[in-house]
Amino acid sequence: MADDLGNEWWEEPAGDASNSEPAEEVKESEESKGNKKKKIPSGKTQVKRKKEVKVSQEAEKEDSAPKKKRRKKKTISDVLAQHAPTAGTPEDMQKLVLEHFENKRSVIELEELQIPDTCFVKENDLTHTLSSYLKEICPKWSKLSKNHKEKKSVLLLVVCSSAHRTLELIKLINAFKADTKVMKLFAKHIKIKDQINLLEKNVTHIGIGTPGRIKALIDQDGLSLESMKYLVFDWNWRDQKLRRMMDIPEVKKETLELLDSGLIRASRAGTLKIGLF
């Protein structure tokens, strides 16, 4: 009695529904791939890329550009290799004094620190020994030394760069000093109180030492300038590094301060002569 519907209405062919859904999925996936391929880079990315390109170009320019060679600073040995050593002159000392004090003193004070050429004895021409040089600049040494009776003062003061050099100069002066008394004036292993006591108790004719200790003795009234007739600087001698005493910053500073402690004033007054050995 019922109509024959053939296949049941709920039974559909297996391939219909299943085939339609995958087709849609494939279509969507292809569209998404296309979108990915056509994706336009953002503004930030473009700026970043431009910066990277610019940096790389600048780096290439720097690599290709010739590098500037740094000038090698000349050493003392380089200068001596090109030019023979020259003896120090009064002008050398005058120039150093002016350069050291020009920004620290008034115009009037600088005038008082000027050392006229008349304050100097003949400088060493690099042919002398210490004894022969002293004999030349102190022709009346024998008479001066015999008449010297004052304590706390010396007739001749020799200024050098170090304690070791002081000991060398004491040996070199033997041919000149005769029977006169020599005292070493440096700080190494010797207390300043002991040096002051020795100067107070004994008559000393020659003092040899470093500028720092000599100035300290003058400042503490251990060494008087009243009897001093000659002030000699070990100007031309060079150490193992080929430095003269005024090439060593600390020694240079102490030497110029020593000159300012009354020695320039004494030389300008005519009681003291300066020599550059």
From Swiss-Prot:
Entries under InterPro entries matching the protein: Cms1 (IPR032704), P-loop_NTPase (IPR027417)
Start-end of Basic residues biased regions: 35-52
GO CC term (a single one): nucleus
Gene3D superfamilies: P-loop containing nucleotide triphosphate hydrolases
Stretches with biased composition (Basic and acidic residues): 24-34, 53-66
Highest taxon, organism lineage: Eukaryota
Annotated stretches, region: Disordered: 1-91
Ranges annotated as biased composition (Acidic residues): 1-14
PANTHER family recorded: PROTEIN CMSS1
Record family assignment: Belongs to the CMS1 family.
Protein's recorded name: Protein CMSS1
